């Protein structure tokens, strides 16, 4: 069996999608019309460093991931058994599963990026060396009640999210702990996947009402629940994803339990491939 995984914010880089925009000219033109700017220019030239601004990053990654998927399907003629995406990448997983078309996905992602970018003064940091339980315990012990766990990317790679000053305080604390191998502040201006996104979630929920989704043709693993989407709760799950943590480790573990599973990353970079390698390695080291 094979699962295609789609990356999210953090995987963007100047030059991504090179060749794809001309190959899929009709969809590229459609994207330009929806966004009101040239997606090709944004990705290849990165004017004003816009590629690292949430409201631009999310549509750019969605388009590049989607075109990468369409090229892969056309060239290899192999459809995956499962799909999953990290945060923003989940929209590409739903697109691949035909839950909505390219245009609908881009409209959703554009709105999501806009709403998330409006909530500033937030920060995020990756803590390496501790598991989710240890991070939660440390936050509680040191009274860092305003910091949330945003992503469980791998068993010992946990991302925290909160107000900028609280994240700086938490990062300083984790750096003093002997078990921690690294604390890496993320280049974001918002406290994504945390309680600070509640307002964005509420507004996005309203926005979703106008759209129609189809039942997924391939199981799509949800970031929020680490199990396949159910059709009745698709919109609710997508809205919840904004202010809930990304259960990436649990999602991959769920897929690994299905039997022999291969994973292929579709889109720019290999961030998810590295995380999956760590999750597999940790699972192999666990006593049976």
From Swiss-Prot:
Pathway note: Antibiotic biosynthesis; bacillaene biosynthesis
Listed GO MF terms: [acyl-carrier-protein] S-malonyltransferase activity
Entry's Gene Ontology cellular component terms: cytosol
SMART domains membership: PKS_AT
Active-site feature positions: 87, 193
Catalytic activity: holo-[ACP] + malonyl-CoA = malonyl-[ACP] + CoA
UniProt EC number: 2.3.1.39
Name used for this protein in its record: Polyketide biosynthesis malonyl CoA-acyl carrier protein transacylase PksC
Classification via SUPFAM superfamilies: FabD/lysophospholipase-like, Probable ACP-binding domain of malonyl-CoA ACP transacylase
Record family assignment: Belongs to the FabD family.
InterPro entries the UniProt entry points to: Ac_transferase_dom_sf, Acyl_transferase_dom, Acyl_Trfase/lysoPLipase, Mal-CoA-ACP_Trans/PKS_FabD, Malonyl_CoA-ACP_transAc, Malonyl_CoA-ACP_transAc_FabD, Malonyl_transacylase_ACP-bd
Keywords carried by this UniProt record: Acyltransferase, Antibiotic biosynthesis, Cytoplasm, Transferase
Role: Involved in some intermediate steps for the synthesis of the antibiotic polyketide bacillaene which is involved in secondary metabolism. It catalyzes the transfer of the malonyl-CoA group to the acyl-carrier-protein AcpK (Mal-AcpK).
Keyword Acyltransferase applies: yes
Keyword Magnesium tagged: no
GO aspect biological process, one term: antibiotic biosynthetic process
Subcellular location: Cytoplasm
Enzyme type, top EC level: transferase
């Amino acid at each position: 069996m094979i699962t295609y995984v789609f990356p999210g914010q953090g995987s963007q880089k100047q030059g991504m999608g090179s060749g794809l925009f001309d190959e899929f000219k009709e969809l590229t033109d459609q994207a330009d019309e929806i966004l009101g700017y040239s997606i090709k220019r944004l990705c290849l030239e990165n004017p004003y460093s816009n590629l690292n601004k949430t409201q631009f990053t999310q549509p750019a990654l969605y388009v590049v991931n989607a075109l990468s998927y369409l090229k892969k399907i056309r060239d290899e003629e192999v459809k995956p058994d499962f799909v999953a995406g990290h945060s923003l990448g989940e929209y590409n997983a739903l697109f691949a599963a035909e839950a909505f078309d390219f245009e609908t996905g881009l409209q959703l992602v554009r709105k999501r990026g806009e709403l998330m970018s409006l909530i500033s003064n937030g920060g995020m940091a990756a803590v390496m060396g501790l598991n989710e339980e240890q991070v939660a315990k440390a936050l509680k012990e040191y009274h860092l009640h305003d910091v949330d766990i945003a992503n469980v990317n791998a068993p010992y790679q946990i991302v925290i999210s909160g107000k900028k000053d609280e994240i700086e305080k938490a990062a300083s604390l984790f750096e003093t702990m002997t078990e921690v191998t690294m604390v890496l502040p993320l280049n974001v201006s918002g406290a994504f996947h945390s309680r600070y996104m509640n307002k964005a979630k509420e507004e996005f929920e309203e926005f979703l009402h106008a759209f129609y989704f189809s039942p997924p043709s391939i199981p799509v693993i949800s970031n929020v629940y680490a199990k396949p989407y159910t059709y009745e709760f698709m919109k609710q799950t997508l809205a919840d994803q904004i202010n809930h943590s990304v259960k990436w480790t649990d999602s991959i573990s769920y897929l690994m339990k299905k039997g022999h599973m291969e994973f292929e990353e579709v889109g720019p970079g290999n961030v998810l491939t590295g995380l999956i390698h760590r999750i597999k390695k940790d699972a192999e080291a666990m006593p049976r």
